[in-house]
Amino acid sequence: MATASEILKQIKENDVKFVDLRFTDRRASLQHVTMDVVCVDEDMFADGVMFDGFSIGGWKAINESDMVLMPDTETVHMDPFFAQSTMVIVCDILDPVSGEAYNRDRRGTAKKAEAYLKASGIGDTVFVGREAEFFVFDDVKYKADPYNTGFKLDSTELPSNDDTDYETGNLGHRPRVKGGYFPVPPVDSAQDMRSEMLTVLSEMGVVVEKHHHEVAAAQHDTLVRNADELGIKFKMQIYKYVVHQVANAYGKTATFMPKPIFGDNGSGMHVHQSIWKGGKPTFAGDEYAGLSESCLFYIGGIIKHAKAINAFTNPSTNSYKRFVPGYEAPVLLAYSARNRSASCRIPFGSNPKAKRVEVRFPDPTANPYLAFAAMLMAGLDGIKNKIHPGKAMDKDLYDLPPKELKKIPTVCGSLRQALESLDKDRKFLTAGGVFDDDQIDAFIELKMAEVMRFEMTPHPVEYDMYYSA
């Protein structure tokens, strides 16, 4: 871990002008405050920086609004997008009275989950990798007032532009609906932009792997290595930040909404997970697909608590528009080797170090700290209570006959159902004080307000179906 004096030395050597203190709010959005370097000294690293917690939705009442941003010296990196030389430091949120971690700080929850894993004796390290898909549009317009509600998206890749007149002519090369996976340019119009994203991510300390066009028109995926422990090192937030910034630099707009377009594939965030102990993988063994019994129990915990986990892994009303059979969405709670129609997939790999579980139902609107911590707690509950996931489902689950299909449990069908499931099934989360009831209740209250707004707002489709009734 770098010391405050070492970071101050870096600031001087790199002629840094500003230090940007960042944290993640309850809705998984990045927040920041920028400090002039004249204010950055060893006292700042020891005492932190005060800020108004009341102005961050759902955190503190106005009569107790003071909170502390405590810089984490392990998270230092430079921001390549700012005009002035700026160093970024991720912060934990502390209570100024007790000096302890604030219980509603998501990053603190992830740290508690890691500590709980170590205390359990099951493992000492959890590795989490993620594949977060996204869309990039040329133009987006939306309105949500009482007398004008709707949205309009545009991208040269959209099939709706087949007959659009452009000044330079319509060149015609674009993906078809559900036909955009892996084409070369010119059908893939974003090759250079995605390469730029990976280049910037690498410069910011993220170990990158590959990128490609995804199934839907205007949909993309860039992959980074599985080297983060519960997202604590901020890699997922850096990833989303870079995607947004690079797209913006190209004159485009990126979104991690799970289902921005009806009738085409949505965006997921597949989360790869494995537990290690003493430098050895605990998920490798002699059971199904080369897994250990412990790994099967981990999967059993994920499946048992999936509906409660959905509140954290799929925390938007839009998340549940993605859960439709036929669009590669992992609706069914089953596990299988290589089978992408199962919600828990075992990627192929002969090396024991590669043995892992890929949970496919999360999406990129999730707060990574909460989502990763919740999945770990569910998996550990499965191991502790020996929850076997049952028989693997190696057939195409999308083609099962209705009678057989009804026997397989599913993810939640709405955010309301997910929040209700979380309210009823929370004991596995509060084990070891990782989550607490105040935090869970506050999260449910915050998200239920979104549900109510969504449910009470007339939808353009309702006009299409019912206006002439």
UniProtKB/Swiss-Prot annotation:
UniProt subcellular location: Cytoplasm
Q: Where is the GS beta-grasp domain?
A: 14-99
Gene3D superfamilies annotated for this entry?
Glutamine synthetase, N-terminal domain, Glutamine synthetase/guanido kinase, catalytic domain
Residues annotated as carrying O-AMP-tyrosine in the record are Y398
Question: What are the GS catalytic domain coordinates in residue numbering?
Answer: 106-469
Q: Please tell me where Mg(2+) 1 binds in this chain.
A: E131, H270, E358
Disulfide pairs? none
- A GO CC term assigned to this protein in UniProt: membrane
Catalysed reactions listed for this entry: L-glutamate + NH4(+) + ATP = L-glutamine + ADP + phosphate + H(+)
Chain sites annotated for binding ATP? E209, H272, Q273, S274, R340, R345, K353
**Key words, A-Z:** ATP-binding, Cytoplasm, Ligase, Magnesium, Metal-binding, Nitrogen fixation, Nucleotide-binding, Phosphoprotein
Q: Which GO biological process categories is it annotated with?
A: glutamine biosynthetic process; nitrogen fixation; nitrogen utilization
Q: Name one GO molecular function term.
A: glutamine synthetase activity
What single Pfam family name could you report for this chain, choosing any that match?
Answer: Gln-synt_C
Which protein family is it in?
Belongs to the glutamine synthetase family.
Q: What assembly does the database describe for this protein? A: Oligomer of 12 subunits arranged in the form of two hexameric ring.
Question: What protein name applies here?
Answer: Glutamine synthetase
Whose protein is this, by species? Rhizobium leguminosarum bv. viciae
